[in-house]
Amino acid sequence: MRILRGSPALSEFRVNKLLELCREQDLPVTGIYAEFMHFADLTSELDAEALEKLEKLLTYGPTIEEHEPQGLLLLVTPRPGTISPWSSKATDIAQNCGLNAVKRLERGTAYYVESSSELSSVQIDIVKSIIHDRMMEAVFGDLEAAAALFSVAQPAPMTQVDILSGGRLALEEANVSLGLALAEDEIDYLVENFTKLGRNPNDIELMMFAQANSEHCRHKIFNADWTIDGVEQPKSLFKMIKNTFETTPDHVLSAYKDNAAVMTGSKVGRFFPDPETRQYNYHHEDAHILMKVETHNHPTAISPWPGASTGSGGEIRDEGATGIGGKPKAGLVGFTTSNLRIPGFEQPWETDFGKPGRIVNALDIMLEGPLGGAAFNNEFGRPNLLGYFRTYEEKVTSHAGEEVRGYHKPIMIAGGMGNIRDEHVQKKEIPVGASLIVLGGPAMNIGLGGGAASSMASGQSAEDLDFASVQRENPEMERRCQEVIDRCWQLGDNNPIAFIHDVGAGGISNALPELVNDGERGGKFQLRDVPNDEPGMSPLEIWCNESQERYVLAVAPENMAAFDAICKRERAPYAVVGVATEERHLTLEDAHFDNTPIDMPMDILLGKPPKMHREATTLKVDSPAMTRDGIELNEAVDRVLRLPTVAEKTFLITIGDRTVTGLVARDQMVGPWQVPVANCAVTAASYDTYHGEAMSMGERTPVALLDFGASARLAVGESLTNIAATDIGDIKRIKLSANWMSPAGHPGEDAGLYEAVKAVGEELCPALGLTIPVGKDSMSMKTKWNENGEEKEVTSPLSLIITAFARVEDVRKTITPQLRTDKGETSLVLVDLGNGKNRLGATALAQVYKQLGDKPADVDNAEQLKGFFDAMQALVRQDKLLAYHDKGDGGLLVTLAEMAFAGHCGVNANIAALGDDVLAALFNEELGAVVQVKNDELDSVLSTLAANGLEACSHVIGAIDASDNFVIRSGDVVVLERSRTDLRVIWAETTHKMQALRDNPACADQEFEAKKDNSDPGLNVSLSYEVNEDIAAPYIAKGAKPKMAILREQGVNSHVEMAAAFDRAGFEATDIHMSDILTGQAVLDEYHGLVACGGFSYGDVLGAGEGWAKSVLFNAQAREQFQAFFNRENTFSLGVCNGCQMLSNLKELIPGADLWPRFVRNESERFEARFSLVEVQKSDSVFFDGMAGSRMPIAVSHGEGRVEVRDAQHLAAIEASGTVAVRFVDNLGNPTQQYPNNPNGSPNAITGLTTKDGRVTIMMPHPERVFRTVANSWAPEGWGENGAWMRMFQNARKNLA
C-alpha cells in the first residue's frame, strides 16, 4: 500500500462549525485541521514515471500551501470491507490513464485535533462521532492502519434454521434475530411448506421470502379484506384505487403492473443519435409520458443524505425500467418532518417532545436530506422542478385524551416523469434460455433488510439492524446504466431488452425472482457470478443486500453481442448471473461452497401467502374550535410567514439543477426577481415543439387529524388548482399518483385510511374524471422510544401526497404568480371554492398558535371544482390571465404576498366581500385561486367564470401598483398595512437560517441582505444584436453541414441539449464518447468543431473535469489526437461547465491558453443552480462575434466554478491579455463579487475565457440549456423561438462560412 497526501479537506467555515459542535459537547478542542489521504493498493511497485503520474492524478482541488499538521490524528475512511463510489471512479480514471499496477485507490480524511488538555477516551469517542458517519465510515488512529481497507475476507457460509426438529419455535427465533418482520400466519405457511419439502430452510431463503412478502413490497394492507365497525366492506383499498381506472381509462397505456405508469403523450421529434451513424437527428414519433412517485421515509430518518439520495435514485430507476426501457426526464422531491427548532430561531409553536437516539432530528434531516436528493438528481442529470416541505409536530386532543402527532419518521418523497416509445410500453416475453443479467454496480454489504425494516414502526427493530438497512449512492454509475438503456430503446424494434426491472428493496433476492416470475418463467442462478466488492459476505448478504444503481434484465442469447457492445462503450459493468427456465422453479448454486443455497418452487416464494384481514373501528375526536384570544393580526402574519410550510424554500431549490436537458419550460423560480413560487413544473416534449408535460403536487396532511376524507379530497383538489396554471385542456388528461402514509394499527387510523381511500377512489376522482394509475403506501408512520423509563411515541397523521401529471398542449401559455405592473390597469380576482365558509381547522394559522381547531376546509362540490379547472383552462388558452396563484397553506394572505414578492410590486386589496371575520377571510385554506386580469378584459373573464358555475364565488378583491405597500382593507377600514419588502424579508428568514447553518454563512448573509433592497430592478436584458435574426440561415440554406464532435465522458449529462443547439445552427452533430477515442473508433481529424459538455465526469472525484482531462493527458494516443486537433487552424472548440473545467486542465495542449485559470469549489461550498445575469466581454472568441456588451441571463449549474489564479499578477495578466469572454454582473450591469449574483465567487466575476486567437472558448454557465426562449426561466417579451444565446452557435456556423 502506498500513502499519498492530498489537499485540505475543510474550509475555514467548515472547521468553525466542527469547533462549535465540539464546544457544545464541552470538549477542550482548540483546533482542527483536515486533509485528504490517498491509499493505493498496488499489484507491483511503481516506477518513477508511474509514481509521478499517480501523484499528478491525485493533485486536485484548491492549491495548498505546505503544512505540517499538529495534534491527535483521527483517520476517517470508508468502512473496511466496502468499496466507496469515490474509489471505484478514481480507480477507473487511474486505469484509463494506463496505471495498470494500481489495483485500487481509496481516500480517507486525516483529522488533526488540537486540545487545551489531553482528551480522555470518552471525549475522543465524542469527537469521532462528530467527524464520521458510523454507517459508512470507520476511524483509525494511524495512517498505516488503512491497510485494512484492502484486506480480503474469506466468504462466510450460509446457515440453516432447523424446523424439522425445532419446529415453529426455531423459525420464531430466526424471525427476530434476522429482523424478518414475518407475520404469524407467514411463519405457519413457511413451516408447513418446508415440512412438505422435507428439508430445513436456509437463512438466505427466509430473508428472500421476508423481503418479497414484506408490507413494503406486497402492500398487504392495501390488498387486505376489511371489516369496519363490524360490517364487512365490499372492496379492498387497492380495488377502490383501481376503480378510478375502471371509470376513466382514457389516455392510460399502463397502470398497476410496471415500475411506473404510462399515459399518452404528444407526437414530437425526439432528438437522439442514430444508432448506426451516431449522428443526432429528430425522430418523429409518440413521446408517451412515464410517471412515478416513491417514498424513502425509513432510510431518511436513519441517515438523511444517503436515505434521500437513494430515494431519488430508486425512483429514477423505476422510470428507466418501465416497459422495455424508458427515459427519466424531470424530478420532484418533498419532505414532511417534525418542527425544525433552528438554534437561536426557535418559534413559539415549536415544543420539544423529545426523540429516540437512533433517528436524526428534523433540523438535521432538512440540512442533509435535501442535499442528498438534489445531489443524485444533479449528478444523474435530471432537473428537479417541484417539491413541497411541511413541518408538523403538536400535542392534540385524541380519543385517549391527548397524544403527540408529528413526523419523527419523516416523509421523503421522490418522484418524476419521463418519456417512452409507443412500442416499448409493454414488456416482452422472456424466452427460455434467455440470459438473466445484473446491470450496474457491484454487491456490497449495505441496505440489508430495507424492505422489512421499512415495514416496522421506527424503534421496533434492534439499532444495528436499522443501520444495516440504509443504502449509499453512486449516481454516476446509474447515469452509465441509463445510457445503456437509452442506446437500447433508441434501436427501436431491435431493442435487445426483453424484460427489465430495477433493483430496490430486497436487492436481487427480490428483483431476480420478480423478473422471472413476471415473465412466467423460472430461473437457474449462479451466486458467484454476481459482481461482488466484498468477498467476505455470506450467501444471504450477497443475494439480499440493497446495493444501489442496479437493474436486472432478460436478453435473448442472439442479442447478447449487441448488448455487450453497448455496455462496453458506455463503460457500464454487467454480469450474466443466470438463465431463464421453462420450469417455474428457483435454483441458486454456490460454486465456492459447492452447494445450493436456494432450491424452491416459485409458488412457495411468491405464491399465495395468507391474505390479510383488517378489523377496524371508527373513532371520531371532538376537537375544540380555535380560540382567538391573543391573536393579533400583524403578529399572526409574521408567524405564518415564518412557518416552514409557508416560508420561502430557496435553500431547497438552488441546490438542485433546474435546467439540465434544455427542456425545462417552468421551474420553481419565477420572474425577474427569481422568487420560488411557481404553481407547477412544465417541460417541453422536445426541442422542435411547444407540446410538453406538467406536474404539480397537493397535500394537506394535518387536516386528517380532524377529517380523514377532507384531507384526501384537499390533496386532490390542490394538485388541480396548481396544475390549472398551464394549458392542458380536458381534465381527463390529468393522471394522479397517490402516496399513502399511515400509522397502521394506531387506534382509529385504519378506519380513517379506508375512509380517505374511499373518498378519492370511489367518489371524488370518478366524479372529476381523474385516474390514479400509480402510487405507493408506507404503513408504519410511527416512532416509539423509551426515555428515562417513560414510553413515548409520536404518530404521524394519515398523509396522502398527490402528484398530478398531464400532457401540455402549449408550454408557452403557462401562467406564473408574478404580478405584472407593465400591463396597464388591472384587477385581482379571487375564486373561492370554499364559498365563504372560511373554515380555519388545521390551518397554518391554527398551527402557529399551537391549536388544531374543529372544522377544516373541504371539497364540498366536485362539480364546482371541475368547473373551476375548465374555466381556468379556457382563460389560459385565450391568454386572458396575467398572473395566477392557487390558494393553499397560509390562505389568501400568503397567496397575495407571494404574488407581490414575485411581481416586486404593491397590493391594494379589499376583503369586504369575504365576510366580517378578518382572520378567517385571510387565513382560511379553502381551495381557490387569485388571478390578475386587465380591466378591459375583466367582464369577459367574469363571464367565463360564471359560465362554469363560479359566479357566486368569484370576487374582484383589488388592484396592484408599483409601490412597496401591501395594504388590505375590509370596506373602508385598513386591517393590514405593511411594507412588501419587510414581509419578503420575514418570509426569507427560515431559508436564510438554514443556508447559514449548512453552507458558507457569509454567502447566506449576502443573499439575505440583497432581498432587503427594494430598488433592485431584477433581471434585465440589453443586446447588441437583433435576437430574432438568424445569421446562420444563409449557410444552412446552402446545405453544407460542418461536422461537430459532441464529446462526452462517463458521467457527462448535458450532451443532448448541446447537440440540439449545434444542430439548429446548421452543424452535423455526432455523439462521441471518450471510449470511442481511446479504442480508436472515432478520430477527431474528421471534425471541424469539438465541444466538451457539462455534467459530472467520473462523478467529479479527482476534481471537477480533472479526471477527464488527465485521462487525455496521460494516454499517449488520446493526447496526440487532442493536441493535433487544437493545433489545426480551421477548427474551433467550446467547453461548457464540466467541459470548461476539463479544457482548462488541457491548457498545455491548447495554443494561446497558457494564462487560463483552474476552476475550484464555489465560495458557498454548495452546488449552485441559478439563473444569473452575465455580460459578454470584448474578445476574439469566434462564438461571441458581434455580442460584446450584451447583457442577458443564463443557466448556471455547478459546484466547482470559482476561478482560481496563482496570484494578483496572474489575474492582471489574464485581464491584460483580452481573453476574458464573459463576466457575472449585478442587475445594474456592474461586474460583481456579491453572492448570488456572482454564484461562485470568481475574482473579477470572470466566468468565461477564450484563447488569444479566439478559436477555443471555455465558460462555466450553460448557453446550450437556454438556446430556446421557452427554456429560459424568465425572458423579456418579444423574443421569438430562439433565445439570446442561440447567437453563439450561429456565430460558430458563420465562422466556418
UniProtKB/Swiss-Prot annotation:
Pathway: Purine metabolism; IMP biosynthesis via de novo pathway; 5-amino-1-(5-phospho-D-ribosyl)imidazole from N(2)-formyl-N(1)-(5-phospho-D-ribosyl)glycinamide: step 1/2. The active site is at C1137 (nucleophile), H1262, E1264. It catalyses: N(2)-formyl-N(1)-(5-phospho-beta-D-ribosyl)glycinamide + L-glutamine + ATP + H2O = 2-formamido-N(1)-(5-O-phospho-beta-D-ribosyl)acetamidine + L-glutamate + ADP + phosphate + H(+). It is an enzyme of class 6 (ligase). SMART domains: GATase_5. One of its GO terms (molecular function) is phosphoribosylformylglycinamidine synthase activity. One of its GO terms (biological process) is 'de novo' IMP biosynthetic process. Pfam families: AIRS_C, FGAR-AT_linker, FGAR-AT_N, FGAR-AT_PurM_N-like, GATase_5. HAMAP family: PurL_1. In the N-terminal section; belongs to the FGAMS family. Phosphoribosylformylglycinamidine synthase involved in the purines biosynthetic pathway. Catalyzes the ATP-dependent conversion of formylglycinamide ribonucleotide (FGAR) and glutamine to yield formylglycinamidine ribonucleotide (FGAM) and glutamate. NCBIfam families: FGAM_synt, PRK05297.1. This is Phosphoribosylformylglycinamidine synthase. The lineage of its organism: Bacteria, Pseudomonadati, Pseudomonadota, Gammaproteobacteria, Vibrionales. The gene is purL.
